[in-house]
Amino acid sequence: MDKTQPHPLFKLATELGPLLVFFFVNAKFNLFAATGAFMVAIVAAMIASYVVTRHIPIMAIVTGVIVLVFGTLTLVLHDETFIKVKPTIIYGLFAAILGGGLLFGRSFIAVMFDQMFNLTPQGWRILTLRWALFFAGMAVLNEIVWRTQSTDFWVNFKVFGVTPITMIFAIAQMPLTKRYHLEPVSLEASEADAGDVRKG
């Protein structure tokens, strides 16, 4: 099925919208109300993404499932630890997937980024390693913040800290993607070879 490319503002809204809902509901009520609202917003964002583009990015699916699982545990057990450790699980999982993929000669970052660009095998290797280390670092950082700071501080960090950090890191990878950019011979070849680090 063909994928419709969404408007950048729509993509931004589906990614940041749930986080803003989480922040404002927590500020108005409490973390448990914010968790419930966050779960609803995540599902709404995925539905909107599918309606508009007929496609849901794999990262959004994985994140959504983990949010629903840990959000449910938070509400049922009335224990905010689960929603706080959720980012650690997500970052750790992404780091493990990327690192494990490299061991088998694959760069799953191509799938995670929805094949936004085409790189040489060396480019995929470097980019994958960088993102694996980034996700591992973010997992550690989340653990430090939620274990040593207040709930409100953690929420602010999650909404206004993580997003800028991720954007800055992603922008910092642009020289790498330009240096190792590869023009595909065909769309089929591009999709077949995307993320294959065994060549070259």
Swiss-Prot record:
The chain crosses the membrane at residues 7-27, 32-52, 56-76, 93-113, 126-146, 153-173. Its main location: membrane. It is found in: Cell inner membrane. It is a multi-pass membrane protein. It comes from the Bacteria. InterPro entries: YciB (IPR006008). Keywords: Cell inner membrane, Cell membrane, Membrane, Transmembrane, Transmembrane helix. One of its GO terms (cellular component) is plasma membrane. PANTHER family: INNER MEMBRANE-SPANNING PROTEIN YCIB, INTRACELLULAR SEPTATION PROTEIN A-RELATED. Plays a role in cell envelope biogenesis, maintenance of cell envelope integrity and membrane homeostasis. Belongs to the YciB family. This is Inner membrane-spanning protein YciB. It comes from Bradyrhizobium diazoefficiens (strain JCM 10833 / BCRC 13528 / IAM 13628 / NBRC 14792 / USDA 110).
